[in-house]
């Protein structure tokens, strides 16, 4: 442990539950922090709990670190965590600063399979874009035909997102007019948004043009900041763990009508 800590003194997080968390792991972490890192002018970044009663152990470990004057040392938890276990730990008052989520982040346990297909939606012939469609017995695998763009609609009053909207590429959304948006498969589900009560942002941006990379790459921090900013524009109800509010990706009337027309023609 001493070799590792002296080699990587600026980013040292110690796993403390390998043998005995409270009798061995945490005391040795305190020893490393006080006798190895602090004399180097460095600080132990944190400790990690990966087994046992994490809520109880985090409280005891926090107290031990604080008594030793190591209030700056953070405590993280891992061990097959998911959103429900994390919520439970927080509700129990666990003294944790961060969570390491692995296997339950790779695949969504509640929806492990994403229904969909990646198919041709148009061809270019003699300078014209000709829409194409894939037909399937499963509605989620029926493609939306044509060259398209995606918008996000926001309420003017709250600044919150209403829905995303897929439109033909040459369709312009006029915010001074009423706008009716339609469910992609359940065509009786639609919503009309009154004129001058919403704004529109286009979501797609060019990455390559004529074979050239034209996108301005962002740093990890910029990506995180943007994600947090966009998350704040969604309703809190979308993030409920139980019975969350659905956020829809709808179609314009033009696109829906054209899709239905193509389906009817292909099924004749």
Sequence positions of predicted segments:
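Gly/Ser/Thr/Ala-enriched C-terminal appendages of enzymes
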Residues: 73, 81-268
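Buried, small/hydrophobic-residue-enriched core segments of structured protein domains
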Residues: 4-71, 81-85, 91, 105-107, ...
């Amino acid at each position: 442990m001493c070799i590792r800590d002296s080699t990587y003194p600026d980013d040292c997080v110690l796993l403390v539950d390998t043998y005995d968390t409270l009798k061995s792991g945490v005391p040795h972490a305190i020893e490393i922090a006080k006798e190895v890192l602090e004399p180097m002018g460095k600080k132990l970044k944190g400790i990690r709990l990966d087994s046992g009663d994490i809520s109880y152990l985090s409280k005891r470990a926090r107290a031990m670190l604080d008594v030793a004057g190591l209030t700056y040392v953070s405590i993280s938890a891992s061990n097959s965590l998911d959103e429900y276990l994390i919520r439970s730990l927080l509700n129990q008052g666990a003294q944790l600063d961060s969570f390491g989520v692995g296997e339950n982040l790779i695949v969504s346990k509640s929806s492990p399979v994403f229904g969909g297909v990646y198919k041709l939606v148009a061809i270019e012939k003699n300078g014209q874009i000709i829409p194409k469609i894939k037909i399937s017995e499963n509605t989620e695998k029926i493609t939306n035909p044509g060259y398209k763009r995606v918008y996000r609609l926001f309420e003017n009053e709250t600044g919150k997102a209403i829905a995303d909207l897929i439109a033909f590429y040459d369709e312009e959304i006029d915010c001074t007019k009423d706008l009716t948006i339609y469910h992609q498969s359940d065509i009786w589900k639609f919503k009309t948004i009154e004129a001058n009560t919403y704004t529109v942002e286009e979501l797609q941006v060019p990455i390559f043009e004529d074979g050239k990379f034209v996108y301005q790459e962002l740093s990890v921090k910029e990506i995180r900041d943007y994600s947090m900013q966009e998350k704040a524009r969604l309703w809190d109800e979308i993030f409920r763990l139980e019975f969350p509010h659905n956020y829809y990706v709808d179609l314009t009337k033009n696109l829906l009508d054209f899709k239905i027309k193509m389906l009817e023609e292909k099924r004749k």
